């Protein structure tokens, strides 16, 4: 499910996403009763940093007032943002980068790493019914399968003490760090894996938890 211009959707419509994102199911209630259906899906959402779209732009000036920026961001509730695993800020691409012939990691190489990581996860979770990948790992099993180095534990503890993350964010950070480690071919979660996972929670800090 791709939602472009996320803040332009009604608050009511966005809040309905909270249950399926959390539980993988949706409950429909009517006067005659209610029914629950499976609702596993991948949510991808995009939005501008502000109404005019230029907040933080290196060359264009933002025309929004601070109150307008805050009002725009408040269209996305903290509980919904808390249920989104990855927050990625896309900066404008410089001309030199577009014109450069130097490429990064190829799509084929990335695909090979993802296939290997998914195979590793299927093997790891054979004893857990209904769990085939890190995203499905229940909270009760996180500490068992997401073992951290002391340095990684220190980073995670410091982030929670400074930023006041929720228990839900804790679970999601560990699952993302587990995936980063799998892509890196590491069984232990080290400082680099936790640091990368924490970088993907940047909107929690900018938007605040509402």
Residue ranges and their predicted role:
Residues 1-5:
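Walker B beta-strand of ABC/ABC-like P-loop ATPase nucleotide-binding domains
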Residues 6, 11-210:
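Basic, amphipathic alpha-helical bundle interface domains used for macromolecular binding and assembly
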